[in-house]
């Protein structure tokens, strides 16, 4: 947990009574569906817009963290849906002094002949307002009549917090995470394992022990890109059940590598629980994987499941964190600038319920792990 973060119990107290206002009917624990024992909760919101999921998962090292995580995910999804008060306008890209849509990495077939819908965003690095395509802000996204859609909308960079600064930091960590993951996925390597056996972090040791006791092999992989912000994947292989649908992973990013590892481990536990939970309602992904078979799925994803090319210890990963969200934001912006990423935008999506939510956009960061149709310069220059 970030040193400046509000305790999860306080977050639950502050925002819990607002869940009914956004249509959440219940938050339920699904930890028991799996045998790992790492807390996972699920929030159900039947009123979610068409094109968006209505069940959200939450993770954490404690039950309180996991419950708060599921709750905040629900507020994020609600806030990302278009609302009547959202001020947007339409214009052809050539007639708008806004962000170049191409910098968002468009699918190869995109033709910018039609008008786009725009919304003003704040530039964290320059203080001025800049119009950005609304397609990169709202989820789900349905363009107004006469306007085109640029790509399938997603939730990358959508984040909440107890305060706006915290939400911006979380959103920034997510877009950096997806970029690092995209680069690894597109290159299919190199696999560098993170050895945590010597860690004195009791939370990490406890999480790893839970997987070990359940007979689930977990490998931690260093995905950190040139941005220098620690990004770690936790890759789980259930050697007891040998169920291909349970070949799962989680990814975590933070200036503090220990927090990145904790996020990755809790997320892979969440991936397992939601996969087990989800297969009871939606069998498409699980059925595909089960038809392919356990060994074949591991071969198809050998860049995750093969022997590592190198190993580092957790202590070798650089800790860039400060004691404040503001300090962490400043360091992150500096690291992005050093990688040639000058602009960081955010749109404040805080709604009438008062839970701080933003969408963070960093033009140039890769999104291949979210949308394989979109391949940018960073991937092309690294392959």
From Swiss-Prot:
It comes from Methanothermobacter thermautotrophicus (strain ATCC 29096 / DSM 1053 / JCM 10044 / NBRC 100330 / Delta H). Signal peptide: none annotated. Residues 58-383 form the YcaO domain. This is Uncharacterized protein MTH_987. PANTHER family: RIBOSOMAL PROTEIN S12 METHYLTHIOTRANSFERASE ACCESSORY FACTOR YCAO. PROSITE patterns: YCAO (PS51664). It comes from the Archaea. NCBIfam families: methan_mark_1, YcaO-type kinase domain. Residues 80-100 are annotated as: Disordered. Transmembrane segments: none annotated.
């Amino acid at each position: 947990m970030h040193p400046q973060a509000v305790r999860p119990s306080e977050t639950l107290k502050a925002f819990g009574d607002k869940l009914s206002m956004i249509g959440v009917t219940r938050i339920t624990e699904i930890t028991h569906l799996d045998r790992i024992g790492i807390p996972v909760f699920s929030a159900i919101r039947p009123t979610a817009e068409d094109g968006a999921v209505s069940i959200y998962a939450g993770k954490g090292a404690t039950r309180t963290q996991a419950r708060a995580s599921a709750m905040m995910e629900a507020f994020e999804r609600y806030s990302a849906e278009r609302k009547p008060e959202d001020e947007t306008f339409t214009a052809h890209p050539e007639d708008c002094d806004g962000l170049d849509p191409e910098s968002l990495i468009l699918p190869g077939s995109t033709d910018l002949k039609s008008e786009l819908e725009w919304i003003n965003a704040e530039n964290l690095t320059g203080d001025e307002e800049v119009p950005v395509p609304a397609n990169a802000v709202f989820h789900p996204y349905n363009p107004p009549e006469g306007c085109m859609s640029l790509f399938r909308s997603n939730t990358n960079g959508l984040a909440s917090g107890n305060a706006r600064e915290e939400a911006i930091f979380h959103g920034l960590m997510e877009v950096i995470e997806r970029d690092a993951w995209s680069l690894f996925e597109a290159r299919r390597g190199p696999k560098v394992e993170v050895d945590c056996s010597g860690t004195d972090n009791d939370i990490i040791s406890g999480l790893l022990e839970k997987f070990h006791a359940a007979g689930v092999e977990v490998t931690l992989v260093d995905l950190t890109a040139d941005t220098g912000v620690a990004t770690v994947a936790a890759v789980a292989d259930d050697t007891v059940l040998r169920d291909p649908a349970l070949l799962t992973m989680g990814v975590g990013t933070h200036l503090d590598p220990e927090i990145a590892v904790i996020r990755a481990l809790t997320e892979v536990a969440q991936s397992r629980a939601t996969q087990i939970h989800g297969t009871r309602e939606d069998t498409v992904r699980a059925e595909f994987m089960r038809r392919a078979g356990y060994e074949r799925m591991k071969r198809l994803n050998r860049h995750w499941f093969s022997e590592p090319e190198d190993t580092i210890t957790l202590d070798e990963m650089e800790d860039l964190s400060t004691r404040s969200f503001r300090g962490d934001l400043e360091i992150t912006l500096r690291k992005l600038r050093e990688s040639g990423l000058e602009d960081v935008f955010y749109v404040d999506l805080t709604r009438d319920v008062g839970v701080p939510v933003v969408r963070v956009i960093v033009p140039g960061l890769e999104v291949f792990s979210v949308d394989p149709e979109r391949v940018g310069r960073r991937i092309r220059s690294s392959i």
